[in-house]
């Protein structure tokens, strides 16, 4: 099964002290090839930015650098 390893940056939902202060959350996620476009739309709708997309072959969790 073809998998994409998507690294994205999303602003956090909680406000800290002031409205101007934002916390960003970086995460890496394995996404099946078929669902990759839907995942991209979800990240963009949350106001996030996709940093990197790589092709991770094989089974989920294999050869993807995720612990």
From Swiss-Prot:
<keyword id="KW-0793">Thylakoid</keyword>
<keyword id="KW-0605">Phycobilisome</keyword>
<keyword id="KW-0472">Membrane</keyword>
<dbReference type="InterPro" id="IPR011134">
    <property type="entry name" value="Allophyco_linker"/>
</dbReference>
<dbReference type="Pfam" id="PF01383">
    <property type="entry name" value="CpcD"/>
</dbReference>
<dbReference type="GO" id="GO:0031676">
    <property type="term" value="C:plasma membrane-derived thylakoid membrane"/>
</dbReference>
<dbReference type="InterPro" id="IPR008213">
    <property type="entry name" value="CpcD-like_dom"/>
</dbReference>
<dbReference type="InterPro" id="IPR011064">
    <property type="entry name" value="Allophyco_linker_chain"/>
</dbReference>
<keyword id="KW-0042">Antenna complex</keyword>
<dbReference type="GO" id="GO:0030089">
    <property type="term" value="C:phycobilisome"/>
</dbReference>
<dbReference type="GO" id="GO:0015979">
    <property type="term" value="P:photosynthesis"/>
</dbReference>
<protein>
    <recommendedName>
        <fullName>Phycobilisome 7.8 kDa linker polypeptide, allophycocyanin-associated, core</fullName>
    </recommendedName>
</protein>
<feature type="domain" description="CpcD-like">
    <location>
        <begin position="1"/>
        <end position="56"/>
    </location>
</feature>
<comment type="similarity">
    <text>Belongs to the phycobilisome linker protein family.</text>
</comment>
<comment type="function">
    <text>Rod linker protein, associated with allophycocyanin. Linker polypeptides determine the state of aggregation and the location of the disk-shaped phycobiliprotein units within the phycobilisome and modulate their spectroscopic properties in order to mediate a directed and optimal energy transfer.</text>
</comment>
<keyword id="KW-0602">Photosynthesis</keyword>
